[in-house]
């Protein structure tokens, strides 16, 4: 079956879940996908965004909010007692974070969609899937961002 992972910020009690981004949750599935969890992690860790070309054009407070924090890519087969409170030492971080931390994946996707190119790419993928997404939460996010079958989308402005 394989080991599933999520990115965990132990400082803030927040997580990123690969499936929220449409990626597989195994380490090599999401770590090599350029437009998903790793891109989200990059904007969360960015210090000084918005000061140069190639930065994410967004004022979203999530950008850079993880800079300097303790981050772990936690697997569901991870060691018990590592990175968790002493009273929870029989759990691993993946399990503990799943139950106690806040998954901010969809909020980060919304921040990424402040960039017209990223938003257009996400829309084109959804359109190619017939405006259907296997993940119900991500489907609702797309309907909120793009409208039913893309009714809110306009011609890209980045071209």
Region spans (language model):
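Low-complexity intrinsically disordered segments
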Residues: 29-159
């Amino acid at each position: 079956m394989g080991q599933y992972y999520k990115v965990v910020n132990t400082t803030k009690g927040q997580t990123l879940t690969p499936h929220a981004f449409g990626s597989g949750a195994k380490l090599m599935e999401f770590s090599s996908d350029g437009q998903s969890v790793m891109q989200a992690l990059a904007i969360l860790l960015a210090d000084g965004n918005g000061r140069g070309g190639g930065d994410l054009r967004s004022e979203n407070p999530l950008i850079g909010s993880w800079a300097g924090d303790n981050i772990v890519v936690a697997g569901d087969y991870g060691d018990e007692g590592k990175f968790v409170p002493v009273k929870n030492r029989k759990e691993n971080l993946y399990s503990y974070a799943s139950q106690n931390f806040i998954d901010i994946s969809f909020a980060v996707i919304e921040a990424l969609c402040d960039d017209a190119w990223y938003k257009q790419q996400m829309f084109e993928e959804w359109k190619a899937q017939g405006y259907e997404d296997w993940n119900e939460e991500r489907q609702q996010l797309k309907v909120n961002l793009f409208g039913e079958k893309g009714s809110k989308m306009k011609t890209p402005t980045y071209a």
